[in-house]
């Protein structure tokens, strides 16, 4: 029986109780959120790890994408990325591998990860066909659903499935309508398959089949935004909104089937449109948790997209987004390395925390109050402990060699805090 089914029966599961304790909420509040579809607790029946909740009233969570590519595939390197992401504070990792031994990478991640694990099953289908020198055109619905069921059986806690890329919605993302067209890998593959076969998306057409698989393993469905805008000029257009309408209907069907579901969101979005996008998703999707990539607030900052993503992520979280997918400095440029992973997680955590303060999530200000008290006391060790990233501030201060231990090299003897402390505590 799934978490949703138990919640609807009034049962507080072990996972719900654990989430309630970590969030400082009552178990009943978490149970009611799960029953209503406003909270998900991803966790495959075949995996055991500390459960984490995503959704309304909870702290904003952060995901880190790792995984190979056709041009770069090293299982050991992906393991180091996994370790780096978790050490930096990621609540989730997604294996987005598309090259090399995909099974070996996924097996390693599922065995080694102490946090929830997600993936995009259609990538495996595409990679296998490519390895056999076959076009994605040759994919059959059975091949796709077989991959989904196999990966769920292996232990994935949630899967991204681009069910909302219908023929009607994909047509609205044509080259004559958008600057960048379709920028989602899964979305573009399905759009091309539908175009070539003149058939509907099997994930949409056979959604009940997908629900059956997800329910069997209590896998959370992350309904992918295959038509997300890849340019700020494309944001909030017909294709994006049509897909969101479809996802709202599918989310309702998932809840009716006692399957946990969350919705993925844009993308590249001007900062003034982010709040409206979040509100629209919540309204159309019945309050389902919103999982956003960024959003990136400008297109012209390659190499710094962890910053554009953090800006958008903070605004989205403040408006009600629940789950931030990190963006790294390598976005749009290359496969992320270990340093990119660490920087991306920290940037997303800063965005999530900033959003939580704005949302007035219980306890969100505690860390800031701790940091401020330590700054007032010139307690440098305490400042390091209160920092989202304790390592970098310690490194920077120790490398600067201040003449006086109580101050830093920015102000030295002119330290405002020291001056005020001397005035108020003579």
UniProtKB/Swiss-Prot annotation:
GO terms for biological process: thiamine biosynthetic process; thiamine diphosphate biosynthetic process. Keywords: 4Fe-4S, Iron, Iron-sulfur, Lyase, Metal-binding, S-adenosyl-L-methionine, Thiamine biosynthesis, Zinc. One of its GO terms (molecular function) is 4 iron, 4 sulfur cluster binding. [4Fe-4S] cluster binds at residues 408, 411, 415. Its EC number is 4.1.99.17. Transmembrane segments: none annotated. InterPro entries: ThiC, ThiC/Bza_core_dom, ThiC/BzaA/B. Pathway: Cofactor biosynthesis; thiamine diphosphate biosynthesis. It catalyses: 5-amino-1-(5-phospho-beta-D-ribosyl)imidazole + S-adenosyl-L-methionine = 4-amino-2-methyl-5-(phosphooxymethyl)pyrimidine + CO + 5'-deoxyadenosine + formate + L-methionine + 3 H(+). Substrate binds at residues 65, 94, 123, 162, 184-186, 225-228, 264, 291. Zn(2+) binds at residues 268, 332. Catalyzes the synthesis of the hydroxymethylpyrimidine phosphate (HMP-P) moiety of thiamine from aminoimidazole ribotide (AIR) in a radical S-adenosyl-L-methionine (SAM)-dependent reaction. Belongs to the ThiC family. This is Phosphomethylpyrimidine synthase. It comes from Desulfosudis oleivorans (strain DSM 6200 / JCM 39069 / Hxd3). The gene is thiC.
């Amino acid at each position: 029986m799934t978490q949703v089914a138990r919640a609807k029966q009034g049962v507080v599961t072990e996972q719900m109780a654990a989430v309630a304790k970590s969030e400082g909420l009552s178990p009943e509040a978490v149970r009611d959120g799960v029953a209503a579809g406003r909270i998900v607790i991803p966790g495959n029946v075949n995996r055991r790890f500390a459960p984490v909740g995503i959704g309304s009233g909870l702290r904003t969570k952060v995901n880190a994408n790792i995984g190979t590519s056709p041009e770069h595939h090293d299982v050991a390197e992906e393991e180091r990325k996994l370790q780096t992401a978790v050490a930096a504070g990621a609540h989730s990792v997604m294996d987005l591998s598309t090259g090399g031994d995909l099974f070996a990478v996924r097996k390693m991640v599922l065995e080694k990860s102490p946090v929830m694990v997600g993936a995009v099953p259609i990538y495996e289908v595409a990679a296998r066909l490519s390895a056999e020198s076959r076009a994605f055109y040759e994919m059959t619905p059975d091949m796709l659903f077989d991959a989904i069921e196999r990966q769920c059986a292996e232990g994935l806690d949630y899967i991204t499935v681009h069910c909302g890329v219908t023929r009607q919605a994909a047509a609205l993302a044509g080259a004559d309508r958008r600057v960048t067209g379709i920028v989602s890998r899964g979305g573009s593959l399905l759009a091309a398959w539908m175009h070539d076969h003149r058939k509907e998306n099997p994930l949409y057409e056979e959604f009940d089949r997908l629900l059956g698989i997800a329910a069997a393993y209590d896998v959370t469905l992350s309904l992918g935004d295959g038509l997300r805008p890849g340019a700020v000029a494309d944001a909030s257009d017909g294709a994006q909104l049509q897909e969101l309408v479809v996802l709202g209907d599918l989310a309702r069907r998932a809840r009716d089937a006692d399957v946990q579901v969350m919705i993925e969101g844009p993308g590249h979005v001007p900062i003034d449109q982010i709040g409206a996008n979040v509100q629209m998703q919540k309204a159309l999707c019945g309050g389902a948790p919103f999982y956003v990539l960024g959003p990136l607030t400008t297109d012209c900052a390659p190499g710094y997209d962890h910053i554009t993503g953090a800006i958008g992520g903070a605004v989205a979280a403040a408006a009600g987004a629940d789950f931030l997918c990190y963006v790294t400095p390598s976005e749009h440029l290359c496969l992320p390395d270990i340093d990119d992973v660490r920087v991306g997680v920290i940037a997303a955590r800063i965005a999530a925390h900033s959003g939580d303060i704005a949302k007035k999530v219980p306890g969100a200000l505690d860390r800031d109050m701790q940091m401020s008290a330590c700054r007032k006391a010139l307690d440098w060790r305490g400042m390091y402990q209160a920092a989202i990233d304790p390592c970098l501030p310690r490194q920077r201060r120790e490398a600067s060699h201040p003449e006086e231990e109580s101050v830093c090299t920015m102000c030295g003897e002119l330290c405002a805090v020291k001056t005020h402390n001397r005035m108020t505590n003579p």
